[in-house]
């Protein structure tokens, strides 16, 4: 019984597309990280100013 080996070639020339999508993904990740940090900073500010009212409002809305 003979066994055949086959080699699969790469996508051939798609490296630029991969690099472009990687750069776009990195940019999107950085933007989302920045937006998340801004939101967390805003939450921290609210909690520093008025933690008790924040907790009361949360519990009144059905939070546990």
From Swiss-Prot:
The segment annotated Mpa/ARC ATPase binding runs over 21-58
> Could you tell me which InterPro entries the record lists for this protein?
Ubiquitin-like_Pup
UniProt keyword terms in alphabetical order: Coiled coil, Isopeptide bond, Ubl conjugation pathway
**Coiled coil in keyword set:** yes
This protein is called Prokaryotic ubiquitin-like protein Pup
Relay the domain remarks: The N-terminal unstructured half of Pup provides a signal required to initiate unfolding and degradation by the proteasome but is not needed for pupylation, while the C-terminal helical half of Pup interacts with Mpa to target proteins to the proteasome.
Classify the source by domain of life: Bacteria
Q: Name one GO biological process term.
A: protein pupylation
* Entry similarity comment: Belongs to the prokaryotic ubiquitin-like protein family.
């Amino acid at each position: 019984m003979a066994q055949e080996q086959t080699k699969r070639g790469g996508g051939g020339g798609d490296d630029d597309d991969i690099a472009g999508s990687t750069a776009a993904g990195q940019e999107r990740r950085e933007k989302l990280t920045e937006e998340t940090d801004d939101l967390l900073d805003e939450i921290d500010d609210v909690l520093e100013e008025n933690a008790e009212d924040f907790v009361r409002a949360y519990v009144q809305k059905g939070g546990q």
